[in-house]
Amino acid sequence: MTRAFLPHIITDDSALGGSVIERSLIFNSSDSTQLENTSLGTSPTSRRICTISVWFQRNEVDEESGLLTHGYSGSGGSASGAPFRFVDSGTRLSIMNDTNNSTDWKVTPSRLLRDSTAWYHLVVAIDTTQGTASNRVKIYYNGVQETDFETANYLSLIHI
């Protein structure tokens, strides 16, 4: 089968044709904008295994901020949840879990995310049933598994 010659302009978003991405969002950090979903229910299919996938593009690289957070504020003002936060002056993404205002586990790849024009595809796979601690949290950027970490305090066995 032959293919007609079609020029391909290589850009950071060439897979998208360099066009506007429909249904994408940009948040103004000074507005404290957020999306909230309260309809997830209280009976997950698994409390031990999950995968989270998201595309994102940085608009403010030099500030520490949250990319994705979930959790709740318990009685007495204690907070629990699993934030994905930009740390180290906003250059690295840290995946962690907090319980009662204390960090249970935290994994921060060494990769710097400083390109405000690039789209990143992040996949985080959590499997607390794995016997080897480093297999319990796996992080992928653009399809490549991260193996070099700034911080690697893995979660304990069956802890979610």
Regions found by a protein language model. Give the residues of each.
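Short tryptophan-centered beta-strand motifs in secreted/extracellular beta-sheet-rich domains
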Residues: 118-128, 139
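Outer-membrane beta-barrel translocator domains and adjoining extracellular loop/strand segments
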Residues: 150-153
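Extracellular glycan-recognition modules
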Residues: 31-94, 131-133
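Low-complexity, glycine/proline/serine-rich flexible segments
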Residues: 1-48, 92-94, 98-103
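Conserved small/polar residues in nucleotide/adenosyl-binding loops
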Residues: 158-160
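Short, aromatic/His-centered strand-loop micro-motif at the edge of beta-sheets
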Residues: 96-120
